[in-house]
Amino acid sequence: MERPEPVVPPSWRERLRCFPWRNTAHTLRERFREDRLGVTASSLTFTTVLALVPFFTVALALFTAFPIFSRVQIVLERWLIDSLIPETIARQVLGYLTQFASKASQLGMAGFSILVITAVALILTIDRTLNNIWRVRQLRPLGQRVLIYWAAITLGPLVLGLSLVLSSYVMSASRGLVNALPEGLRFIFDSIEYLALAAGMAGLYHYVPNTAVRWRHAWVGGLFVATCMELAKKALGLYLASVPTYSVIYGTFATLPILLIWIYMAWIIVLLGAVVTAYLPIVMAGVQRMPGQQGWQFEMAVEILQYLEQERESPAKGLYASDLARRLHVDWQQIDPVLQALSVLDWVGTVQAPGVAAGSEGTEPRYMLLVDPQHTPLAPLVERLLLAPSAAVQPLWERTGLAGMTLASLLESRPRP
């Protein structure tokens, strides 16, 4: 008896060749347009400019309160100049922020309260935007959201600064042992800054949305942001060096429009990274059907009900939204409004797995069919997702007999494989 040949997994080249690049680009473009992320980036840019001083004040207060971290502050400022902001405006912006932050202590209670409100407004805008991208319907309590972000604001610069201090210390020690730093070691040290930004973005995408986000998906988004940030910084620096339009027109005030452009570009990249992270599971599963034709939601509702009807006799009694999206070959966020409509009709209900902590992986509810198709009229579904009754279409309702049809008559056909 011949043994079956072992299955060889496809190589990474074959996976890249078979990857649905066109559908992926179409999905990401549609999500960016529907969520109006360009407008959101503009709003975040304006709020960020107002919140820069409060955030920088908090960081300086932390370093001032603990003189042991003075080295951390110096290295962190150097990293901001060399890595995060284009060199054309980095030193001027950092100088202005330091000057403004030092004067913030002279504000009264009213002025300081306005700064705090501005910082909190930026926090809530980021939180709301990311949760909208993940289609989260229930946000965390306000106090919990502010606490999470405030911890990130205060501890984030400290942790990042300590890592940069450690890397600079190792680099200094290495230079003392050898005349020139090996290229491989230099590449490792240069990669630390890149990975620090990627890790920060991965943490943002993993912890902020009030839903389960896998770490590997968050890291893909973080690496996407870190790569695009580096490319955008070099592109903007090259443009400003080649075409000094802003310096010629605005003179000494050129820093402000350049800073606004850079912040806007940065937020566009961060929001795109969130879209990549949120839609990566669907992209990897292979989205083959796109919305657009008439009656799309009604068609999805019928197929969802067909699958849930089949699962009534199974031990699970239902399906997760991700399972439904995989079987329907659609983006799970496209069927979310359909599931909400079926829930409003009390045709579909959700069951949460017992003993699972909220926010952890596995918290996705299972959808189950609650009605008996033999005794459930079809008219409510048609009215909600396809054709509302009116005097103009009343003859159609009467001739087709829609008012007298039951759900069972629509579920007789088997769903597509």
Swiss-Prot record:
NCBIfam families: yihY_not_rbn. This is UPF0761 membrane protein Daci_4966. InterPro entries: UPF0761_bac, Virul_fac_BrkB. Belongs to the UPF0761 family. The keyword Cell membrane applies. It is found in: Cell inner membrane. It holds the Pfam family Virul_fac_BrkB. It is a multi-pass membrane protein. The keyword Transmembrane helix applies. The chain crosses the membrane at residues 49-69, 106-126, 146-166, 187-207, 235-255, 256-276. Coiled coil: none annotated. PANTHER family: INNER MEMBRANE PROTEIN YHJD, UPF0761 MEMBRANE PROTEIN YIHY. GO terms for cellular component: plasma membrane. Keywords: Cell inner membrane, Cell membrane, Membrane, Transmembrane, Transmembrane helix.
